[in-house]
């Protein structure tokens, strides 16, 4: 398995180049992070490699992982040091900064699948969703003896496939925090994921991402627009219809583009109705964005499935199904390491494609079929 391969690769001269190439995008990232510090016992750079290798390694728990790499890796931290570092607020800030820098580099080097539609120029587009890990071994139980899964909210850049961790669910006031409550706790900068001022941001969410009052505030104050689907019990008052170019291939399947007023919010939002030509299914999409062709609104929502595929990767490729530790900081650290590992994999896949012509043809076919 790749995880074991990368942990052994550190000293095995036969396969050393693969590890060097896999981790190459991380070179010098530590030096550019404001929270980086000189730590002789376990450097920030070594901590990045330990955490990422923990994600891709095959061992089922932290103790077994540290034991498996200690004979080959001289920088292996002691078990107590590993778990203490997981709970370090400073290291978490550093890891977030490193992932943000890596995501920015991905935007400079990876092909942009949205570049084919000029109308999207000036928009950064992210798919967001919640994801759960099983409770950690030492997580507290409630009065009934129940441990609750740990919820996280992530966002995937649909231009680069770079993965960002937004936050862990409230560990104190909620047993299971709703996505919208997590979103409302975030700073404006966090919700824009490093997007430069002047560039609009589109967040594509499932039905858990609907709050029309908040959508309006995000649009007016932050330049953030939402795309989602209506819940079954929502009631709308029909407003004026929007004109669109039915002859444009991007609008294939569009049967309506109209403004509607939700019963709970008497400001118009946009509703696009789409019939899938292949399956005959009718979908309705809601958005606070008023200018893009309706077919692009639908296409962006369909691309939201990409983040579900990343979650499948977390669970069934990385085998990351359980929280590593109990503190909120440690749980966030694990989530950021998952993002770093995914982002390095995306860059490595690009290298394999460009230099060796190796592609994941089966997944490419599945994705084309979804879209």
What residue ranges belong to the model's regions?
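Conserved, well-structured functional cores that handle cations and Mg-NTP chemistry
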Residues: 1-284, 288-293
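Short conserved micro-motifs at the rims of enzyme active sites and ligand-binding pockets
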Residues: 296-298, 351-352
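Short amphipathic alpha-helical "interface-anchor" segments enriched in bulky aromatics
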Residues: 297-325
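Basic, amphipathic alpha-helical segments enriched in Lys/Arg and hydrophobic/aromatic residues
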Residues: 320-370
């Amino acid at each position: 398995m790749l995880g074991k391969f990368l942990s052994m690769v550190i000293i095995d001269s036969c396969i050393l180049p693969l590890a060097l190439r896999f981790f190459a995008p991380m070179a010098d990232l530590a030096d550019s992070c404001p929270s980086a510090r000189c730590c002789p016992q376990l450097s920030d750079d070594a901590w990045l490699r330990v955490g990422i290798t923990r994600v891709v390694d095959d061992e089922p728990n932290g103790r077994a992982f540290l034991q498996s790499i200690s004979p080959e890796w001289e920088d292996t931290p002691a078990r107590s040091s590993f778990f203490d570092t997981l709970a370090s607020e400073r290291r978490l800030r550093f890891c977030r900064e490193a992932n943000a820098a890596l995501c920015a580099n991905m935007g400079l080097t990876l092909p942009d699948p949205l570049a084919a539609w000029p109308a999207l120029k000036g928009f950064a587009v992210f798919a967001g969703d919640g994801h759960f890990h099983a409770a950690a071994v030492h997580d507290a139980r409630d009065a009934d003896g129940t441990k609750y899964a740990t919820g996280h909210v992530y966002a995937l850049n649909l231009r680069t496939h770079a993965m960002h961790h937004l936050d862990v669910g409230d560990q104190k006031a909620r047993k299971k925090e709703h996505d919208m409550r997590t979103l409302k706790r975030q700073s404006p900068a966090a919700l824009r994921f490093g997007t430069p001022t002047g560039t609009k941001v589109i967040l594509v969410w499932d039905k858990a991402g609907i709050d029309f009052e908040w959508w309006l505030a995000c649009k007016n104050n932050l330049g953030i627009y939402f795309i989602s689907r209506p819940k079954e019990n929502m009631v709308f008052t029909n407003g004026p219809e929007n004109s669109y170019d039915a002859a444009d291939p991007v609008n294939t399947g569009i049967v309506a583009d109209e403004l509607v007023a939700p019963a709970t919010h008497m400001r118009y939002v946009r509703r696009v109705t789409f019939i899938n030509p292949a399956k005959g299914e009718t979908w309705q999409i809601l958005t606070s964005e008023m200018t893009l062709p309706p077919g692009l609104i639908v296409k962006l929502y369909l691309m939201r499935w990409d983040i579900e595929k990343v979650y499948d990767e977390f669970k069934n490729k990385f085998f990351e199904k359980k929280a590593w530790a109990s503190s909120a900081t440690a749980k966030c650290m694990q989530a950021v390491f998952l993002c770093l590992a995914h982002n390095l994999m995306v860059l490595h896949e690009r290298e394999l494609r460009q230099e060796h012509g190796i592609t994941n043809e089966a997944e490419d076919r599945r994705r084309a079929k979804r879209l």
